[in-house]
Amino acid sequence: MNLLNLPKIELHCHLDGSLRVETAIELAKKEGIKLHSYEYDKVKELLVISKECNSLEDYLNRFALPAKLLQRPENLERVAFELMEDASKENVKYIEIRFAPLLHLEKGMTQKEVIESVIKGIRKAEEFYDIKGNLILSCLRHHSIDSVYEVIEEGKNFIGKGVVAIDLAGGELEGFVKPYKEVMKLARESGFRVTIHAGETGYGKNVRDAIELLGAERIGHGLFIFNDEEAYNLVKEKGVTLEMCPKSNIDTKGVNKYEEHPIYKYHKDNIRVNLSTDNRTVSNINLTEEFENVHKTFNIDFEDYKKIYLNSVEASFCSEELKEKLKLSIII
């Protein structure tokens, strides 16, 4: 299989974790942000995870510099455009980019301006490249419940205009789900689709709760459903798609190597999986490389690839019209 040339669907990709190193250097200079060095390799060390990373919390520290750089509309528009551009070059036909609007208000932008800027970058890229994109608005679990209401209130105005879903992200604690039951009910009623980061660390029950209490249609990662039989069976029976990011899971020590990752086992047991990068820069990987690693490890064939692709199309939050077009890309 020529994996580079095959069409791809990416459903789990964080904007601020996928910033080009050279762009970070330019923006740091433009914004007057002092770094110890502006040399490429030194700045890369600030953005890309090291082999010494020991946990998800350690991994999340790589988002500090991007947060400082993405406080102006033109900067957000640029990185959104560049992410779409990078994805298109490896034949990603559709991507759902997620980011947390409330992290970009430090220099006076409103949430409305933040969301508009990212959508503008996505739409601009669609004019130049054979790729389509939409936005998922992430809310951070270490922020207040009220902050989720704020995101819903502003974000609902962009449903059908570039925003498709809401997400809960950040550090994961056991049993985090229950306090979000009412606010996620409001999100669904406001037109948001729902995907939730859960089971990324060792808590399979979080996945079950996210589906049953929050109405999650997809799960970000879902790695640890194997340690909760009820969660495993629920995901399988309901056809919930797991947005799986093996390299990221290795980086955060969820698993130690590709051979230990359950993605292929889940796939062969008819659990719906999507393969994504999570954070292209932080994990230093693109989607073609991720597929190559999975292919080498588990010897997936074209039928496996096609099934994952079509499952990903069905699990996407885009329009039915676009889904039909995306399906045609893989019919060979």
Curated annotation (Swiss-Prot):
Its cofactor is Zn(2+). The record marks 221 as: Important for catalytic activity. GO terms for molecular function: 2'-deoxyadenosine deaminase activity; adenosine deaminase activity; zinc ion binding. The active site is at residue 200. Binds 1 zinc ion per subunit. Substrate binds at residues 14, 16, 170. It holds the Pfam family A_deaminase. GO terms for cellular component: cytosol. Belongs to the metallo-dependent hydrolases superfamily. Adenosine and AMP deaminases family. Adenosine deaminase subfamily. This is Adenosine deaminase. The lineage of its organism: Bacteria, Bacillati, Bacillota, Clostridia, Eubacteriales.
